[in-house]
Regions:
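Compact, glycine-rich, soluble single-domain proteins
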Residues: 1-121
Length: 121
């Protein structure tokens, strides 16, 4: 996985203060498997993908499907273990702790942006 990034919402608010990026074959396949929880403010951006599953996971998640410009296409709230969600034409999926979409006010059509956690970049 690459260095974590910060995801910023349409209104400039921090949506995910520590977002890991899974963009390799192994990291995309592994996703959040093996973790017992996902802390508030943390997330996993999987790219490229248009579908996710929660097989073998131990907790529910919110999934935000994004296009290539980071515009929200679909929300899958409180996706429990052993479920799947997809959105055709999505470029990536942001996995957050269950309830984060509602808490942060994320909605379809919102445009996200990212910033590096590395001050040298």
């Amino acid at each position: 996985m690459r260095r974590p990034i910060v995801l910023i919402g349409t209104e400039g608010q921090v949506l995910c203060e520590r977002c890991e990026i899974a963009d390799g074959f192994i990291s995309r396949g592994r996703g959040l498997l093996g973790r017992t929880t996902l802390a508030r403010g943390h997330g996993l951006l999987i790219r490229p993908t248009w579908s996710v599953h929660t097989a073998f996971m131990r907790f529910a998640i919110d999934v935000v499907f994004l296009d290539a410009e980071l515009t929200v296409l679909k929300l899958a709230r409180n996706l429990r273990p052993w479920r799947a969600a997809s959105r055709l034409r999505a470029h990536s999926a942001l996995e957050l702790a269950a309830g984060e979409c509602d808490r942060l006010g994320i909605g379809v059509g919102d445009r996200l942006a990212w910033a590096s956690l590395d001050p040298a970049r």
